[in-house]
Design a protein with these regions (language model features):
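Internal alpha-helical scaffold of NAD(P)-dependent oxidoreductase catalytic cores
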Residues: 1-76
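Long, positively charged, glycine-interspersed low-complexity recognition regions
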Residues: 131-138
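Interdomain hinge/lid region at the active-site interface
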Residues: 62-127
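Glutamate identity and glutamate-enriched acidic tracts
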Residues: 17, 22, 34-37, 94-97, ...
């Protein structure tokens, strides 16, 4: 596991880093702004996308009957605790909007040019992110 420390004015973090390592985790130091931007990209926005994806197609009975592991896995975050989901959107909405803009830009970019080349690059980069046990190795 990775634990993000957001020290105030970058106080001495050695004791906390030592404790985190002793507990078997990896400490990462970031400013609150950096932390909020990052979690918007990898947690809050994906939850929002999962909610939107499910909501957009839930009324198509055939699609719901045919839905299997891909749809299940992609929409899992739609079941996030409701209070937590509202807090994410309320307290980190600006960063979620920035992530959404980047996402839409990427969607548009994928439609242009050599799609196979682009998804090959994406697939290769994504495969290098996790080891065989599913642990993020970056």
């Amino acid at each position: 596991a990775k634990w993000v420390m957001t020290p105030y004015d970058y106080d001495d973090t050695k004791i906390l880093e030592s404790l985190i390592k002793e507990l078997g985790a990896t400490p990462i130091v970031a400013s609150p702004k950096e932390h909020d931007e990052a979690v918007a990209m990898i947690s809050h926005f994906p939850m929002y996308v999962a909610q939107c994806l499910y909501s957009a197609f839930k009324d198509n009975q055939l699609a719901m009957k045919l839905a299997s592991s891909g749809f299940r896995d992609t929409t899992r975050l739609a079941m996030t605790d409701l209070t937590l989901a509202c807090d994410m959107l309320n307290f980190n909405g600006e960063n979620i909007e920035l992530a959404q803009e980047k996402f839409v830009q990427t969607l548009n970019d994928l439609k242009k040019g050599n799609y196979l080349e682009k998804i090959t690059e994406i697939s290769h980069a994504r495969r290098k992110m996790y080891n065989s046990e599913g642990k993020n190795i970056l």
